[in-house]
């Protein structure tokens, strides 16, 4: 069977949207809104008057019409016509305008004064646990893609506007379209970002720049539960075990087996979030003992598997309600 040469796609294939929340804001200067953070990946694109966006602890950026912004982990931020203005909490606006869960009733509102207006389209994605634990933490808290740098900008902007309009008009299939089109926009941004970083970053991003290591990385990401050994991974890379282990650690920053363990635990987190019983998750991840798996999982994320499962269920409810 012919192997893929597009290893970045192989790795990013785990980044799937499981739910989507959409919104459209009509904002007239002066205005300022503050978010304390949301449990998801936020994508926004605006039209009309430029506005400012500042992630907590970061320098502000001016967002021009057609620019795309992505907050991979939904970090706390302020967006405003003027950052000197005292912001109103997003949660207050949601309480005021939302009607039921937002994934059932997309949010739209008008806010501000009588000055120049901006329209901001927004989609919030609940991304698969495997991606949230392994891919998204590698990103900066804000990715800002100017309209002239998007490739191609017109199509990407049209995709986002289409998914917002479908959801606001409740067209048949809008929920699935919102998930898939939002996912498409996110993967487009991630692929461009990571492709530009391959020579600078350590970790799997840098590993993808090397054809042999990239093959092994794609194999791990594609099937983390497989009974991989150092020998079988070296064989995937067409290298000797010693040379493979040395080169993998130099590029990725972790040994092949340590990296494999990280991917398995992230894969386990995704299965726990789907509601699978602990014993089944342990077996799927190659553990004969539920107790041994539970210890390994707790070392990885700081929570026992059942506590993680309860927390993820609570976050899903928060994502849907956003109250």
Where are these regions (language model features)?
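Short, Lys/Arg-enriched, Trp-marked, Pro/Gly-tolerant hinge/linker segments that flank
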Residues: 143-154, 167-226, 230-237, 250-258, ...
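A hydrophobic/aromatic-rich effector-binding and dimerization subdomain
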Residues: 8-14, 76-162, 195-196
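Terminal helix-turn-helix DNA-binding modules in bacterial transcription factors
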Residues: 215-222, 226-234, 239-240, 246-295, ...
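Amphipathic, well-ordered alpha-helical segments in soluble domains
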Residues: 18, 42-45, 155, 159, ...
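Generic protein-terminus/edge-of-domain signal
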Residues: 1-68, 74-112
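Generic structural signal for secondary-structure transition and capping sites
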Residues: 17-20, 51, 168, 194, ...
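Generic structural signal for alpha-helix termini and adjacent loop/cap motifs
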Residues: 49, 82, 166-169, 192, ...
């Amino acid at each position: 069977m012919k192997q893929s040469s597009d290893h970045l796609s192989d790795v990013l294939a785990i980044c799937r949207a499981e739910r989507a929340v959409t919104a459209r804001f009509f904002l007239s200067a002066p205005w300022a809104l503050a978010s304390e953070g949301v449990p998801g990946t936020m994508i926004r694109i605006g039209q009309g008057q430029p506005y400012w966006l500042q992630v907590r602890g970061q320098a502000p950026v001016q967002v021009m019409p057609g620019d795309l912004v992505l907050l991979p982990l939904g970090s706390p931020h302020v967006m405003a016509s003027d950052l000197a203005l005292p912001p109103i909490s997003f949660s207050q606006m949601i309480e005021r305008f939302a009607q039921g869960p937002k994934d059932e009733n997309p949010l739209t509102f008008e806010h501000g004064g009588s000055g120049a207006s901006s329209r901001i389209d927004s989609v919030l994605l609940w991304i698969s646990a495997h991606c949230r634990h392994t891919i998204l933490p590698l990103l900066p808290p804000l990715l800002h893609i100017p309209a002239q740098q998007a490739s191609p900008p017109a199509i990407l902007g049209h995709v986002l506007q289409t998914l917002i309009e479908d959801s606001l008009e409740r067209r048949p299939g809008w929920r699935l379209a919102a998930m898939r089109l939002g996912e498409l926009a996110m993967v487009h941004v991630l692929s461009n970002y990571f492709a530009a970083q391959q020579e600078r970053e350590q970790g799997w991003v840098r590993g993808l720049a090397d054809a042999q290591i990239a093959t092994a990385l794609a194999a791990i990401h594609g099937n983390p539960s497989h009974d991989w050994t150092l020998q079988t991974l070296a064989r995937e890379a067409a290298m000797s075990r010693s040379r493979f282990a040395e080169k993998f650690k130099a590029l990725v920053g972790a040994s092949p087996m340590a990296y494999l363990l990280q991917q398995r635990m992230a894969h386990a987190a995704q299965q726990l979030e789907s509601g699978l019983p602990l014993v089944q998750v342990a077996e799927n991840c190659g553990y004969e003992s539920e107790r041994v798996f539970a210890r390994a999982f707790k070392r990885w994320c700081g929570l026992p598997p059942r506590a993680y499962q309860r927390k993820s269920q609570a976050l899903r409810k928060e994502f849907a309600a956003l109250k």
